[in-house]
Curated annotation (Swiss-Prot):
UniProt protein name: Sec-independent protein translocase protein TatA
Region Disordered, residue ranges: 28-97
Superkingdom of origin organism: Bacteria
Record membrane topology: Single-pass membrane protein
Length: 97
């Protein structure tokens, strides 16, 4: 059940009578302005991406972390001693079994 041209014209006439032509014109202008603004922002985003690619940057890749020259923290003497004691005890348990 498709709409023919006469059905569409009658619907358009009813809408125009309900809202008035001035209000419909304003709604159409607002909608057109929103679409233009959206297209413009999309174009600007594409231009920024192209500029980044031209500069050698890539937005898809994460930026590399800066290398820190600080050495890793060393274990404390107490932690090393307890680790050695555990290893000795395990070795002793294996040898006596």
């Amino acid at each position: 059940m498709g709409f023919n041209i006469w059905s569409l014209l009658i619907i358009l006439l009813i809408v125009a009578l309900l809202f008035g032509t001035k209000k419909l014109r304003n709604i159409g202008g607002d909608l057109g302005g929103a679409i233009r603004g959206f297209k413009e922002s999309m174009r600007e985003g594409e231009e920024e991406e192209a500029q980044k690619r031209a500069d050698g940057e890539s937005s898809d890749e994460p930026e590399p972390l800066e290398h820190q020259d600080e050495p890793a923290p060393e274990q404390t003497t107490q932690a090393r001693e307890s680790s050695s004691a555990r290893q000795s005890a395990e070795h002793h348990d294996r040898s006596t079994s």
